[in-house]
């Protein structure tokens, strides 16, 4: 059930630049290092308030690191409220033995 808001949602791209000095011409040159896309909360984009990811384990595992730790907000792009909901859902899934506590 996707809303039109999610379809119309566009990412903003921000470019980080590096300033270098060209000795031959005596001018400063600016070249882009990499393009960083602005992260957004995917749950806010579709207007989903309640997160119950226990039914969908593949979606739940997307928020885990390779060592089965919960990824922080700066990596997932979630807002504060939805990151807390994701963390609670992951902890519930760990308690129910759907997701491991630690990878070996």
Curated annotation (Swiss-Prot):
Record GO biological process: translation
Domain of life: Bacteria
Keywords, in A-Z order: Ribonucleoprotein, Ribosomal protein, RNA-binding, rRNA-binding
Gene3D superfamilies: Ribosomal protein S18 (4.10.640.10)
GO molecular function: small ribosomal subunit rRNA binding; structural constituent of ribosome
Family the entry assigns: Belongs to the bacterial ribosomal protein bS18 family.
Subunit annotation: Part of the 30S ribosomal subunit. Forms a tight heterodimer with protein bS6.
NCBIfam families for the chain: S18
Protein name per its UniProtKB record: Small ribosomal subunit protein bS18
Organism: Mycoplasma pneumoniae (strain ATCC 29342 / M129 / Subtype 1) (Mycoplasmoides pneumoniae)
